[in-house]
C-alpha cells in the first residue's frame, strides 16, 4: 500500500475509534481521553512553534491559564455565557501573546527559552495573587457548557466537542503548513536572511506563529475551565508547561500527529505513575517529576524524532512506490514585472565604503549593471567581494556611498524590501530546506508575489493563489531542467543540482536582477559547464545577472563585463580578455591577472 493510502486508513480507523469509544468506555477512560484532547491542542501549537518554527517555549501553560481564568471569571462573576466568554478569552490570550512575543521573540540562542520561563512564572504568580481570581484557592462553581438545552457537564457529553475542536485544529494546521505562510514557517530554521531574500519578514512570521500557538493553548484553556468547572494556578505553572513540551517532544516535534501521540503517551504514563508510585514510596510526587525528567533526557538522546519519527521510518520501509501525481489544473499565471529595455542601467553603485573599525573592507567602489548583461565581480580571497555583495543586497549597512536600483536609492533598506523590488539572490553556502520538496523550495521564492495570510491559508481559502504559486514553481523547475523531480526532497540532491535549484527559487520571485554569490564554488567541471549554460540561457531570455566569483575560468567564458576588486578597491572594469593577452602587457590588468591566478 502506498503512503497516502496508509495515511487514509490510519485516519479513518482513528476517527471511528474515537467516535465509538464513549459508547463502550467508562467515565475514567472518557475523562482521560478528554484530557488527552485538551493536551493535544496545546502540544499541537508547540509542534508548530517549536518543532517546525524553531522557537522553544517553556511558558505555554500560562496561555492555557489566561483563557481558562478569563472565561471562568466572566461566567462566575458576571454570569456571561461560556460561548460569549470564548471570543473574550481568545482575544485576551492573543493580545497577551502578541505583547510577550514582541518583547521576547527577537532574542536569540538560549535567551528566548529563558525568557519564556520568566514570563511563565510571572503569569502563574499573577493568577495566585489576584483577589478577583480567588488567589491560590482559584475559582469554583464554573458553569458547564450548554448547546441549547443540552448540558455538556458529563465527560461523555463534552467528549465530542473536545475532539471535534481537535480535528478542526488539526485541519487548520495541516492546511497552514501546505500554503504560502506554511512554507515560510518551515523555512524559519533556515535563518532570517533566507526569508528576507524572498521578501518575507522572519520576525513577523515567527510572531504570528507564536500568537497562533497561544490561541490553540487558549482554546484548550477554555475547554479545561468548563469541563472541570474549577481553576487554580497550579495547572498553569512552568511545570505544566514543561509537561506540554514533553508531549510534543515525545510524539515528534516535526510531525503534527506527534501532538496527539505525545499527549496520549505522557498522560497515560502520568496516570500509571500516580497509581503505582504511592504503593512504593511516600514521595510519589518527587519521583514522578524525576521519571518525566529522565524520559525527557532519554528522548533527546535517543529519539529526537519522537515516536512519529519511528512511525515515519516504518511507513517509508513498508509503503509501496509513490503514485504518479496528477498534473495541476492550469490557472492564470502570477503577474509578471515588465523588464527594463536591454542596456538600461538597473543597478548603480557610487562610492561604496564599508569599514569594520579600522579595517576598510570596501573602499570607494563604483560600477553599474545594465539590463540584459552578465557582469562578473571578481577578485582574490580577501578582495572585498563578499562584503560588496552584502552591501548590494542590503544584508550589511554601508559606511558611505550609495546604491540605486531601478533609479531608487536602496541604501539602508531592509533586505526583504529590496527583494520585493526585484533583486533576487543566491547564497555562497546553499540555503535550501532539505525536508521540503523541490517544488516547495522554489515556490518559497514566489512568496512576495501573493499576500495570503495565516487565517486564509488555514481555512483553505487560498486555493487559487496556491495553485498559481505551485504552477510558477513548476514552470521554473521546467526552465532549469528539474521539472520531472519536483516532488523529491531537496536534501537528496547533489551540491551542483542544489545550486541550480537555488537559482530556480530566485527566478520564482520574477526578478529584474539576479545576484549570485559564488555559484560555482565546490562544483566539478561538468557541473560548472551545466551551470554556465543555464546562466547564458537565462541571459538570452532577458534575465540580468551579477556574479560574485573567484573562479576565473568559469567567469571569463561567461560574463559580458568584469569588475575586478583587490584589497577592497576596484582595480579594473571592462570586457573580459584572454589570459594570454593580459600576460602580454605589463599593465595594471596584468598585475590583476597574476593576483587572481595565485
Regions found by a protein language model. Name each.
Residues 1-328:
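Transmembrane alpha-helices and adjacent helix-loop boundaries
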Amino acid at each position: 500500500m502506498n503512503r497516502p493510502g496508509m495515511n487514509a486508513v490510519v485516519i479513518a480507523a482513528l476517527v471511528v475509534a474515537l467516535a465509538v469509544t464513549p459508547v463502550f468506555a467508562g467515565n475514567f477512560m472518557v475523562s482521560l481521553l478528554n484530557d488527552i484532547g485538551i493536551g493535544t491542542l496545546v502540544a499541537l501549537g508547540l509542534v508548530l512553534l517549536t518543532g517546525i518554527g524553531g522557537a522553544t517555549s517553556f511558558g505555554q501553560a500560562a496561555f492555557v491559564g489566561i483563557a481558562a481564568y478569563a472565561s471562568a471569571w466572566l461566567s462566575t462573576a458576571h454570569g456571561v455565557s461560556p460561548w460569549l466568554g470564548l471570543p473574550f478569552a481568545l482575544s485576551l490570550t492573543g493580545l497577551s501573546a502578541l505583547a510577550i512575543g514582541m518583547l521576547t521573540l527577537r532574542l536569540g540562542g538560549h535567551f528566548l527559552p529563558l525568557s519564556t520561563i520568566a514570563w511563565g512564572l510571572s503569569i502563574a504568580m499573577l493568577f495566585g495573587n489576584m483577589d478577583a481570581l480567588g488567589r491560590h484557592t482559584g475559582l469554583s462553581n464554573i458553569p458547564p457548557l450548554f448547546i441549547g438545552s443540552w448540558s455538556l457537564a458529563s465527560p461523555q457529553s463534552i467528549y465530542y466537542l473536545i475532539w471535534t475542536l481537535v480535528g478542526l485544529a488539526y485541519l487548520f494546521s495541516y492546511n497552514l503548513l501546505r500554503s504560502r505562510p506554511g512554507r515560510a514557517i518551515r523555512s524559519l530554521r533556515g535563518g532570517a536572511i533566507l526569508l528576507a531574500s524572498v521578501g518575507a519578514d522572519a520576525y513577523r512570521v515567527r510572531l504570528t506563529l507564536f500568537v497562533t500557538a497561544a490561541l490553540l493553548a487558549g482554546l484548550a484553556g477554555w475547554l479545561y475551565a468548563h469541563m472541570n468547572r474549577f481553576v487554580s494556578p497550579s495547572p498553569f505553572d512552568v511545570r505544566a508547561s514543561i509537561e506540554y513540551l514533553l508531549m510534543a517532544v515525545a510524539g515528534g516535534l516535526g510531525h503534527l500527529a506527534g501532538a496527539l501521540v505525545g499527549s496520549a503517551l505522557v498522560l497515560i504514563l502520568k496516570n500509571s505513575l500516580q497509581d503505582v508510585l504511592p504503593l512504593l514510596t511516600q514521595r510519589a510526587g518527587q519521583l514522578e517529576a524525576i521519571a518525566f525528567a529522565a524520559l525527557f533526557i532519554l528522548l533527546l538522546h535517543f529519539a529526537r524524532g519522537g515516536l512519529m519519527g519511528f512511525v515515519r521510518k516504518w511507513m517509508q520501509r513498508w509503503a509501496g512506490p509513490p503514485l504518479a501525481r496528477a498534473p495541476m489544473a492550469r490557472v492564470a499565471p502570477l503577474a509578471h514585472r515588465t523588464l527594463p529595455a536591454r542596456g538600461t542601467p538597473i543597478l548603480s553603485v557610487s562610492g561604496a565604503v564599508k569599514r569594520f573599525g579600522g579595517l576598510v573592507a570596501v573602499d570607494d567602489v563604483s560600477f553599474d549593471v545594465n539590463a540584459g548583461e552578465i557582469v562578473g565581480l571578481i577578485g582574490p580571497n580577501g578582495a572585498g567581494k563578499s562584503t560588496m555583495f552584502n552591501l548590494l543586497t542590503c544584508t550589511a549597512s554601508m559606511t558611505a556611498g550609495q546604491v540605486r536600483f531601478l533609479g531608487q536609492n536602496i541604501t539602508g533598506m531592509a533586505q526583504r524590501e529590496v527583494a520585493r523590488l526585484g533583486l533576487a539572490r543566491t547564497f555562497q553556502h546553499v540555503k535550501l530546506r532539505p525536508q521540503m520538496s523541490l517544488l516547495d523550495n522554489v515556490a518559497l521564492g514566489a512568496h512576495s508575489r501573493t499576500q495570503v495570510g495565516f487565517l486564509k491559508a488555514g481555512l483553505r481559502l487560498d486555493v487559487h493563489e496556491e495553485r498559481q504559486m505551485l504552477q510558477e514553481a513548476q514552470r521554473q523547475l521546467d526552465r532549469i531542467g528539474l521539472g520531472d523531480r519536483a516532488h523529491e526532497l531537496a536534501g537528496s540532491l547533489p551540491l551542483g543540482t542544489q545550486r541550480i535549484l537555488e537559482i530556480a527559487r530566485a527566478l520564482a520571485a520574477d526578478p529584474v536582477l539576479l545576484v549570485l554569490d559564488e555559484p560555482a564554488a565546490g562544483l566539478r567541471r561538468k557541473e560548472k559547464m551545466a551551470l554556465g549554460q543555464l546562466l547564458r540561457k537565462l541571459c538570452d531570455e532577458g534575465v540580468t545577472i551579477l556574479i560574485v566569483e573567484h573562479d576565473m575560468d568559469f567567469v571569463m567564458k561567461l560574463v559580458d563585463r568584469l569588475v575586478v576588486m583587490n584589497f577592497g578597491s576596484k582595480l579594473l572594469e571592462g570586457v573580459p580578455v584572454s589570459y594570454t593577452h593580459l600576460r602580454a602587457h605589463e599593465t595594471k590588468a596584468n598585475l590583476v591577472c597574476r593576483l587572481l591566478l595565485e
